[in-house]
Amino acid sequence: ASPYGTEVCGMIASSLAQAGITVVSGMAFGIDSIAHTSALDAGGSTIAVLGSGIDNASMTPREHEPLGRRIDGPKGLIISEYAPGSPATKGSYPARNRIISGISQATIIVEADIKSGSLITAKCALDQGRDVYAVPGSIFWPRSEGTNWLIAQGAHPLLHIEEIVERINGTQPSLLESPVNPAPNNDSLEERIVTLLSQRGPLHMDAIVETLTCSAPEA
């Protein structure tokens, strides 16, 4: 992970943990381990989903055995669909990503190059009807190429950590939810957009369309 990714991931995981939200990741090098560690350091809970068996002989990476012992405590949980003694394979990591997204209310991609397995997790999340957030990054940085691409494809850009905390805790509607029988509003579309942005801060076009039930060309 880059210094930028490390700082952002730490802030996100800590904020979620302090809000009582469980952080789920894959206990791999980089962003995964930062997410788990930051959640635990903040006094929160975390779940690690492995692409191998959960026994010491199979768990990978071996360098993360101390982290695994820390997660496997009062505030954490390690799970796997693979039996003890099953080593990680090239295909087991992408396969476990569907579990990471499946047990999560939202998926956040902090850093990813264009071929990153994190993009598989994002696709799984969309297929499962979950919200997908991506952290924007420099157009010159390869590890932001995947996240910037996700945003271009419609993922919600994560600009304010408070936004996802509020959404997961239920004080904001899911990006995938459409308003049910919204009350009539006589304000002009422009006034409604200004009001919405003043209440929630910067929003992706898709979120504006979903919230105001207008078409993209109108917005």
What residues fall within each predicted segment?
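Glycine-biased, small-residue-rich flexible motifs in mid-sequence functional cores and linkers
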Residues: 1-219
